[in-house]
């Protein structure tokens, strides 16, 4: 083939350091928009970004030249720096790890609705229960002793 064609969709999830409720509601919409901008600047497409005080969800389309580890490094470091400089959250940190789960095109709308409904969703279930449920749904093996560091 003369060109490379790729469809790589990832539902990415990561929390604040020690799952602290560090992302105040007044910063959230700006943070989600900023994360989308970091994605655009790095040739990714952020189809959806959202979350709550202690974690973020992104639905990303990655170019064929980018690894998921590279994408997470750019988004997490860029958004952390932005929170330090623009919001005065100088002690803010994301956790070291993340979850990245592939989805098919038929799952885009459901994943976007899930991301958009985070505030409502977390009135009933905390982040830890949510993340373990995602791991199970995607068939990811894990040792509960090491999920949270």
What are these regions (language model features)?
Residues 1-149:
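Basic nucleic-acid-binding interfaces
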């Amino acid at each position: 083939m003369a060109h490379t064609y790729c469809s790589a969709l990832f539902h990415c999830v990561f929390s604040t350091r020690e799952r602290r409720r560090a992302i105040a509601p007044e910063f959230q919409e700006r943070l989600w928009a900023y994360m989308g901008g970091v994605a655009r600047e790095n040739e990714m497409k952020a189809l959806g970004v959202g979350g709550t005080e202690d974690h973020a969800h992104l639905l990303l389309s990655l170019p064929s030249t980018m690894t998921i580890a590279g994408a997470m490094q750019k988004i997490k470091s860029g958004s952390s720096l932005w929170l330090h400089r623009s919001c005065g959250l100088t002690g803010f940190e994301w956790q070291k790890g993340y979850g990245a789960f592939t989805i098919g095109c038929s799952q885009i709308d459901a994943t976007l609705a899930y991301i958009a409904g985070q505030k409502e969703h977390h009135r009933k279930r905390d982040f830890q229960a949510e993340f373990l449920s995602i791991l199970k749904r995607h068939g990811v093996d894990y040792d509960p002793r090491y999920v949270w560091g």
